[in-house]
Amino acid sequence: MVSSEVRDLLAQVPNWSQADRPAAFRTIITTITSSPDPSHFAADLKAVTDAIFLESLGVVATRALVIDLIDALKSLASGGPSADSINSTTSSIWLDVGKAIQQHIQSNPTLATSLVDQTATIYEELLAAAHESQNSFTDAAKTLAAIPLDSSQRRVTDKYKADLWIRIIRNYLEDDDATSAETYLNKLKNIIHNVADDNPVLNLHFKLSAARIQDSNRQFLAASQSYYEISLSPAIAEEERLHTLSMAIKCAVLAPAGPPRSRVLARLYKDERSASLEEFGILEKMFLDRLLARAEVEKFAQGLAPHQLATTSDGSTVLAKAMVEHNLLAVSRLYRNIGFDALGSWLGLDSGNKAEEITARMIEQGRLAGSIDQIDRIIYFESGLEASGEKGSGRAEVPVGKEMRRQDGMVQALAEDLERITDDLLVEFPQLVPAGVPGN
């Protein structure tokens, strides 16, 4: 409800001349912000806003009064127009009055064209900040996205665009909307090279946003590499570097098993800082291709984000799939061949057929070297052949009978070694040769 004092002041405005009315409105705005009772702020400022736009004051006078209204609203924040310094009462006033001002501006084409800078300020410093303080991050992002850029009346720098888009991206990511965030990240990629060198903090935010989007999109290998690069940056505190290193390890663990992941794991494992992190135990086992127990996996899962525990199209979680594939690689280091059912038991799967399906997919994708005998239900791991990570590179080019031929070769080599030893003994001790044996 409008206070009686403001109502009386507004009633006197028609008595003022057209030239003196801007000053009259400015006096009313000052009266409102000076009042010790904030309960009428929103209603009083909205009443003044309505009265200002009902008058035909002209663009110049209206612009000046809009600036006064914006300053009056910003003065309500204890530490400036940032989400951290805005209480719930202030954010509500900013939203109510800010939207009212903006609606009046947009309803008048002349003002909408002429007050572009003021529109941007309302969106950026009032409405978006208020939404952020109320944890309405998607609303904040949409508000920021409405700010006009590069109109004929307003030119902005690449630095301004980059700061704005980073803020939009971070708001969308707060609500786990990676799809919308990626739209603005792609825009940012086109200009980041123009501002990155002179703005290391902005460049860091760009890299972190890219890593978070890759993480949310389950591009875990790329996310791990991005997080690790950030963890080496001297621009952030040691605690933050360790946190991003931890995120790099988590993403590497969740990445599809295979040569590319092995290279990333090696890099993380050899980083001396990793040993101080809680995730080092599982990192070490994965790097050394050791089998992971269910209890270890469950403990690791407690530190993952919700999207990292999401269910995939086949009903399993990303973590469960990653662990099965890792343990399959570990089994390939222990056995040269194994039956479908036995492998399924090792991997904790319901059936051997599921084990065959996973193995076949990894071989086809070049993440595991081996071959499958579907008739005898046996999987042969090729210990001397490393998959490259390229599709099809894991398929062995030799027939399944390789192991039998390998055994034959070993027996033949043993026989040849035995014969050579016998010949050497006979040369050294000819008396051991029985009488009548040829050559004696």
Curated annotation (Swiss-Prot):
GO terms for cellular component: COP9 signalosome; cytoplasm. Residues 216-386 form the PCI domain. The keyword Protein biosynthesis does not apply. It is found in: Cytoplasm; Nucleus. Pfam families: PCI, PSMD12-CSN4_N. InterPro entries: PCI_dom, PSMD12-CSN4-like_N, PSMD12/CSN4, WH-like_DNA-bd_sf, WH_DNA-bd_sf. Keywords: Cytoplasm, Nucleus, Signalosome. Belongs to the CSN4 family. Component of the COP9 signalosome (CSN) complex. Component of the COP9 signalosome (CSN) complex that acts as an regulator of the ubiquitin (Ubl) conjugation pathway by mediating the deneddylation of the cullin subunit of SCF-type E3 ubiquitin-protein ligase complexes. The CSN complex is involved in the regulation of the circadian clock through its control of the stability of the SCF(FWD1) complex. This is COP9 signalosome complex subunit 4. It comes from Neurospora crassa (strain ATCC 24698 / 74-OR23-1A / CBS 708.71 / DSM 1257 / FGSC 987).
